[in-house]
Amino acid sequence: MAGGVVILLCGWVLASCHGSNLDVEEPIVFREDAASFGQTVVQFGGSRLVVGAPLEAVAVNQTGRLYDCAPATGMCQPIVLRSPLEAVNMSLGLSLVTATNNAQLLACGPTAQRACVKNMYAKGSCLLLGSSLQFIQAVPASMPECPRQEMDIAFLIDGSGSINQRDFAQMKDFVKALMGEFASTSTLFSLMQYSNILKTHFTFTEFKNILDPQSLVDPIVQLQGLTYTATGIRTVMEELFHSKNGSRKSAKKILLVITDGQKYRDPLEYSDVIPAADKAGIIRYAIGVGDAFQEPTALKELNTIGSAPPQDHVFKVGNFAALRSIQRQLQEKIFAIEGTQSRSSSSFQHEMSQEGFSSALTSDGPVLGAVGSFSWSGGAFLYPPNTRPTFINMSQENVDMRDSYLGYSTAVAFWKGVHSLILGAPRHQHTGKVVIFTQEARHWRPKSEVRGTQIGSYFGASLCSVDVDRDGSTDLVLIGAPHYYEQTRGGQVSVFPVPGVRGRWQCEATLHGEQGHPWGRFGVALTVLGDVNGDNLADVAIGAPGEEESRGAVYIFHGASRLEIMPSPSQRVTGSQLSLRLQYFGQSLSGGQDLTQDGLVDLAVGAQGHVLLLRSLPLLKVELSIRFAPMEVAKAVYQCWERTPTVLEAGEATVCLTVHKGSPDLLGNVQGSVRYDLALDPGRLISRAIFDETKNCTLTGRKTLGLGDHCETVKLLLPDCVEDAVSPIILRLNFSLVRDSASPRNLHPVLAVGSQDHITASLPFEKNCKQELLCEGDLGISFNFSGLQVLVVGGSPELTVTVTVWNEGEDSYGTLVKFYYPAGLSYRRVTGTQQPHQYPLRLACEAEPAAQEDLRSSSCSINHPIFREGAKTTFMITFDVSYKAFLGDRLLLRAKASSENNKPDTNKTAFQLELPVKYTVYTLISRQEDSTNHVNFSSSHGGRRQEAAHRYRVNNLSPLKLAVRVNFWVPVLLNGVAVWDVTLSSPAQGVSCVSQMKPPQNPDFLTQIQRRSVLDCSIADCLHFRCDIPSLDIQDELDFILRGNLSFGWVSQTLQEKVLLVSEAEITFDTSVYSQLPGQEAFLRAQVETTLEEYVVYEPIFLVAGSSVGGLLLLALITVVLYKLGFFKRQYKEMLDGKAADPVTAGQADFGCETPPYLVS
């Protein structure tokens, strides 16, 4: 357990706190009950916060209020402003922005409304305030007048005979009612009735000149007749919409056609008149009355009469009484046309612009984002002083920008003396877009643009230009996409370098919030914070108000060299850290100014109903140094030859910290509470030195340090004999600043970027050499094969080599033994032997990468780092021997000893030895089951023969092929009498077989065969077959057959009835090269036995003849005996005679005996 503690203590490294630069212990909190207080916030004038509450109901038709919040008091006061009377419900404070010189503030209310007749327009309005928050002017100076668009509306009513008088009267009432809705406007009316006759009832001039215009409708009488609709449309275009009849050139021209059916016998087609009406800009509304328009052809004709698209310009009602039901709908569409300033009835220009949705103050004047301009394509208005405003957009004809909300966010970039305007369009093509505009020849034109990648991400909803190196030129543009969705986090901010800096405008990095907040809305608010970590680079803050179930969070990202933003946040401040009541913390941000007058920048964060001011912490920069005395550990201290542990003093270490401010502030002599940790030999299992004060390898303390130099001296001890005296003792210092309640203004300092929070110093050992820096080692090496005489590849899986290394010179540093061996061997393990009264043997061996295909090497470090003077060690290194290895007939193993002393090689530092090599094989020969096992014979058959076969199979189960010889011995003669006329069938080509006769080993066959009834080559003359197989491949299988006719004349010499006929086979190979697998030698030989058994043959003719004669004689004898006994005498007559003498008996006998039962009826 003690060793484990040492590991934990000596390997411990304290992480220093560089990251937290904002104070979250004592924030300044501003709270108001006003609706949406904290929706926007801006630092202003270096001493105050201006907070927007855009939804607060200030008075009737007046929404939005600004608050002046003083950090010194923690109180907020409403700012009394006089909003323009015509700016109804403007939501003042929905956007706030200050000038770079803090001299002006622009507060906007983009929902400022104005009612024009029946329409309500949202133009927006802003207030420009001075340095004392006094009103300077409204931007724009006044709300625009209601559009005075003139309209000339002509009625073309159907007077054909298909309409009855009552319906015609209802149609006239509809005309009068519609005319009445446009009373007191600049709208003029005219009316023409058509059938096959066309009649103008009143012109625009007549309508204009009469006091009671509706009296013009009452005298109208129905014409009756056919339906010439197309002709009527052309007549209206040519006559009513003519200046002679009072039609105005500046007025929009609207034609209302009321009909109950299709045209009939009209000489004109619609194709003759509709294109001309479109060209003249006449907006046509077609009203179809009755059931006729249920037919597709009639409906198609009605759609042709109306302008495109039909859903906006064609109406159908079931009867004339229902015309009133569409009156309001038609009226609203016509009013909408009156409210627009375009030729199209379905698009707006600036009527719904919502100027001030975003804003910026530039040297050229205020810039107001106008998201609603041109059907929410968007843009921005620049208001130069004493000049008409300039509208900046992608051009109103750019259909690609429809519903893009360009101007949703606004930022200003400055590069090489040129101002650029950056506008966000988060709904562009549903993925978002950001465009940079620059001024060329007094015209603002798009220079670069970048598009979002995810649908619904709202890419471009927030923008922030960043001057990273604070040289006055914009380096980066941060683009927020707060609704960007990933499975575990929501929102992202893309970092784009300004195009003028690095060419193309493309994303350089992407910033994200913490995992686990898919609805976090990271990036909804962005601000430049200033330098809070002392690296002279601008840092940024990013809000994520949706994190932690909408409690919210703010992230701090530091600027980096090369004009970048660090990809990981340095600090994350959550709303729940500050107060459990906070909601949407981070929905608005403002930074860069010192509002608390401590010389340090502050960050203002808006939440729901709250604004919090977070102060940045003072920075300290610390320089570290360590000095040792003496500068190395003396030999007398660390060497102990008898290994008797003695605690000796190694020296002293003086640790110094020099503290000064990391950035200027107004806090005076800042003091910091420092926690420091000293560790000796960190990372080692066992430290070679300890501190005298703690008696272990670590020392921890805490001190309060002010500005200046601070030093402390510690004593170092060596508690044990030092084996590694080559690498120096490492002393590592780690320290961190911890919070101290006594800090000025309750601000505890943190380390500035670039400040040291750790230092490492080395204390070397004095070398044991005659020359001060160079030791003369004298190494020697030898080895043997641990008693092994022959290496059998495949039989010996391992090769163990016993190695002896000695040093007859001075200390040898980094002693290394390198072994070189063939590729069939591989390093497996090493085992050392410990000698008494010696240092523990330390071995570390490893295989090295192969430099040659057929050569391998391994190296062993001996007693690293020092193999001392006079030392000698013996160890055993074991190699695996591959069963597939081919090593030739001898294995050569070489070894070389070397060190870092750089002494030249000698004949003692290299050694080599050879070992004979054999290869394990596994070949076998076996008998086959289909050999002839048993033969019966009879000596009476004389020279009759029988065929017999002995079958053998040769297999090679070795991992290599080899040349073998197969020998067969077959008995063929016994005492000169033929036994077996045998031949050998060889298996394949390439196998050559020869034969020769071999005399018996023991000619006294009779004695031998009586002892054991076996006929083999020991008593018989044998035929010896010798078959050479030059290459028996791996897994080869060869069959040999000994086949021939057996003779049995020799059997009588054996005096045996049963004899075993035995053939033998044997495999041989070059035993100087190969060795049969141990324990498998029996499979190199085999034999086949055939049992020969004699039987006696009997003649069947004599047996049959004798049996027949004997049977006849026996039959005759039996017959004579029966005759003598009277067996053949008849007694029937005597029986009849006996029955006649007894009538009764005779009658009964007659009936019972003479009459068979089956004849009775």
Curated annotation (Swiss-Prot):
Binding site for Ca(2+) 3: D594, D598, D602
Keyword Cell membrane: no
Annotated motif GFFKR motif, positions: 1126-1130
TM spans (from-to): 1101-1121
GO molecular function annotations of the record: integrin binding; metal ion binding; protein-containing complex binding
Membrane topology field: Single-pass type I membrane protein
First-listed, main subcellular location of the protein, grouped into a coarse class: membrane
Ranges of the Cytoplasmic topological domain: 1122-1161
GO CC, one annotated term: external side of plasma membrane
Disulfide bond sites: C69-C76, C108-C126, C656-C711, C769-C775, C845-C860, C993-C1017, C1022-C1027
Subcellular location: Membrane
Domain notes: The integrin I-domain (insert) is a VWFA domain. Integrins with I-domains do not undergo protease cleavage.
Name of this chain's protein: Integrin alpha-D
Organism: Rattus norvegicus
Gene name of the encoded protein: Itgad
